[in-house]
């Protein structure tokens, strides 16, 4: 699995994806989220793989254990590299997800979403009724994910250092909420730059609009890639 910045393909059609990817002449690591997957279906994955790109299928599965396990068994037949669930579904759900995934392709990495980068501490306390800091809530979910056999988590870069210190370097910390210094934060609340994410312990970063909405996506990608890889 490549250690490149993961480009979030926040589009709603195969045509838009093709138009974007046609600008690049190099292997990429891209993220297919719910919006795109639900609009285009699994066939898009094959066409992106034909271009030589790694794929993070970001569907954030969250249901009863049996349902998630069966769904993940189906997803394991797709040619993807990384997929995720919501850690809030619990350890049994995460274990069933892992079992389902390993039925057809044990090489696919499985990670768990801890807290969305749009979540604030006020939302955590008042809406989720979790009376801890975001850092403690993320670490709790990360610990459950690791104990369930998962490869890592999705978290903000702001929590990556704590997770790294507690759970080790090899446990993946895939971090959205990445913005260059001159970019808008959009709807992300807990954000950092690529350089800071690396320093804080992120193993992979996810970047969307600063690249996909850029006037020059290739140049913006290379700038972020250089900042990330050093």
Curated annotation (Swiss-Prot):
Gene Ontology CC: cytosol
Stretch forming the signal peptide: none
Active site (UniProt): 60 (proton donor)
Matching Pfam families: OMPdecase
Membership in a protein family: Belongs to the OMP decarboxylase family. Type 1 subfamily.
PANTHER family: OROTIDINE 5'-PHOSPHATE DECARBOXYLASE (PTHR32119:SF2)
NCBIfam families tied to this protein: PRK00230.1 (NF001273), pyrF (TIGR01740)
Protein name per its UniProtKB record: Orotidine 5'-phosphate decarboxylase
Species this protein is from: Staphylococcus saprophyticus subsp. saprophyticus (strain ATCC 15305 / DSM 20229 / NCIMB 8711 / NCTC 7292 / S-41)
Protein encoded by which gene: pyrF
């Amino acid at each position: 699995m490549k250690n490149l910045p993961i480009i979030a393909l926040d589009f709603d059609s195969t045509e838009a994806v093709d138009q974007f990817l046609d600008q690049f002449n190099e292997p990429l690591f891209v993220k297919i989220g719910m919006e795109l997957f639900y609009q285009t279906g699994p066939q898009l994955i094959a066409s992106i793989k034909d271009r030589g790109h790694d794929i993070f299928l970001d569907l954030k599965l969250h249901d009863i254990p049996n349902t998630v396990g069966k769904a993940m068994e189906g997803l394991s037949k797709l040619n993807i590299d990384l997929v995720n669930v919501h850690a809030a579904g619990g350890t049994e759900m995460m274990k069933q997800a892992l079992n389902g995934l390993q039925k057809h392709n044990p090489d696919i990495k499985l990670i768990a979403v801890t807290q969305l980068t749009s979540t604030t501490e006020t939302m955590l306390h008042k809406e989720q009724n979790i009376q801890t800091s975001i850092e403690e809530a993320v670490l709790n979910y990360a610990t459950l994910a690791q104990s369930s056999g998962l490869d890592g988590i999705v978290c903000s870069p702001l929590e990556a250092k704590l997770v790294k210190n507690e759970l080790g370097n090899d446990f993946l910390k895939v971090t959205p909420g990445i913005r260059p210094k001159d970019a808008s934060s959009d709807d992300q609340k807990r954000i950092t730059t690529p350089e800071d994410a690396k320093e804080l312990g992120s193993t992979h970063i996810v970047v969307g609009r600063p690249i996909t909405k850029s006037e020059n996506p290739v140049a913006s990608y290379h700038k972020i890639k250089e900042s990330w890889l050093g």
